[in-house]
């Protein structure tokens, strides 16, 4: 690689990711620092550049959604109740779903493996249900996050914060 042409702060036009320069590669030497820079690597405190970079970083994260698998609904794709979980609630919600179905209830569930960005089909999945019950082992931060992105849905929270599983 010709180091005079290598621009480590330029971004790929499709993914907005910066170019990869494995450490020690001849011709790709450069400095990395925590201060914001322009696309050519010059330190910048310019307000317009800062705004552009903030928007560019947000867009980079949003574009990751194209590579995130769609949510898979366990159960009917529409109905009264959708149980929602993420992280360590997977097994507990699966068991609750099975027990509710054994009791004759119709219930569906989804488990989020990706939360920022959310899977592309999240809004479509949610639109099929009257109530969305978000089960969390915290104070309901994920439910709050979902409400900010999709405020049109009816969310209920099932939270447990005693340091124990459901």
Locate each region found by the language model.
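Flexible, low-complexity linker and terminal segments
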Residues: 1-166
């Amino acid at each position: 690689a010709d180091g005079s042409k290598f621009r480590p702060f330029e971004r790929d036009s499709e993914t907005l990711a910066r170019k990869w320069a494995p450490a020690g590669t001849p011709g790709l030497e450069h400095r990395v620092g925590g201060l914001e820079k322009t696309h050519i690597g010059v330190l910048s405190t310019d307000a317009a550049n800062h705004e552009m970079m903030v928007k560019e970083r947000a867009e980079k994260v949003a574009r990751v959604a194209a590579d995130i698998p769609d949510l898979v609904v366990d159960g009917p794709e529409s109905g009264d109740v959708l149980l929602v979980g993420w992280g360590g609630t997977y097994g507990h919600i699966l068991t609750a779903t099975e027990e509710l179905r054994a009791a004759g209830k119709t219930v569906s569930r989804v488990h989020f493996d990706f939360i920022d960005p959310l899977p592309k089909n999240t809004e479509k999945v949610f639109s099929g249900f009257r109530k969305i019950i978000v089960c969390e082992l915290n104070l309901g931060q994920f439910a709050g996050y979902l409400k900010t992105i999709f405020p049109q849905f009816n969310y209920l929270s099932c939270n447990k914060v005693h340091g124990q599983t459901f």
